[in-house]
Amino acid sequence: MSSSTDSTPIEDEIFSESRSLTFQMLLGSTADSLQLSRFELRVVRFFNDVCVPFMTYNVNKRHVYVWEKVIPRYFTSSSAIRSAVLAMGCLTIMPLCGLGSVLNDKLNADELTRELEAASETWKVQRVFADDHLFEGAKMDINLFTRASEYFGGALNGSNEALMKYQSPDRTKQEKVNYLNEASISNYLIYSFLALQPWKLIPLVSFAEDGYEPKNDLLNVAMGLKTIVFSDYDLLITSDIGDLFHADELHYVPPRKVKFVEDLKNQFNDYLGGISFFDISSEKSAFINDIRHCLLFLEKAFILSVKFNYPVNLYKWLVMISPQLVPYVREKNFFALRLLYAYACICIHVRLWSFEHSVWRDYIVWFRNKFWPLYEFDERLFHYVITKKRYVNDENFQTLKNFDVWSQEFDY
């Protein structure tokens, strides 16, 4: 059986450019007919030209078809998806405007917000939208950061509303499909936005301080996305967006060892070395099985990334294994924190960020400061991705098969 990442000549025809209500067609419409400003129409173009290729890599034709041909239909009818698309489009534009130059590790969330808002007022950013044909009437100032924040807030509100409508007991099956799809796509984009944004909107992990409730974090968002997707998985995967959430390729991964994951497996065995067989309680047994499940899925994600030069399963890993990993991170289990650290380093290496400053980098720096001195494996990872800034180049993810932390290129 072929995986959903493969395509056949028949699929090449089915998913060809000849079929379509696409973002390209939307972009050929007038702004007024879509009830968009001309600024928003340009943002949609950035989403189509940059975000969609980033999410599909033009490898999985089923995914390409959904993003290019199906999502535009929801864009015109769903305020949640429209806001999420516009938020992602704005975020995509920001690095192209040089906004990364104001980011600094020493700035907190409020300071970053002020810096990005002020930088977005400069002509260097404004000129991107200053074409004569772009604005009608009086001059309009576009603050890219403010717009991104507003659209993101709209996406959050819209996705919550769609989820409540889906959960209402008096909905028809078709209404439930529509609202489930709306909630799934908008939350998929919300998770992506939060993973990519650089201004500390939420951290990767937030631990409760004494006397305070824990703040929201990316782990919660990952678990929430998986909960939505699996609330009625059979209904979702048979819908017109179902191909985005099929995981059939994970069930047909060829057996192959991955050096990076083998190292983590060996370190987990070392971690368990001090536990006697007779001391293994049901809780410890569940922990061992859960971590091994996480490592197995990480191994599969690596193999598929190399085989298809397609890293999307690496991006999805945290969502997919969140029920198994997150509870132990919340308990501050050291190996769970280390595994998340290793994954964050991989996210940096494969460029799961819009700016070098990201939730992944923040967690890596926090972990290193918290548990200094690190194990040599962890320290070598830190210098490779943070100090040396060694990233995947030219979208050549097949280099992951040679990702060996003990090799000379990781020396520091």
Please place each PLM-identified region on the residue numbering.
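C-terminal effector modules of eukaryotic transcription factors
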Residues: 34, 38, 42, 73, ...
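Amphipathic alpha-helical dimerization/protein-protein interaction segment
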Residues: 1-167, 408-412
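Internal, conserved structured core segments that host functional sites
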Residues: 98, 134, 140, 144-228
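Short sequence/structural elements of tandem HEAT/ARM alpha-solenoid repeats
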Residues: 102-106, 203, 358
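Extended, leucine-rich alpha-helical cores of fungal transcription factors
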Residues: 63-84, 110, 138-146, 173-182, ...
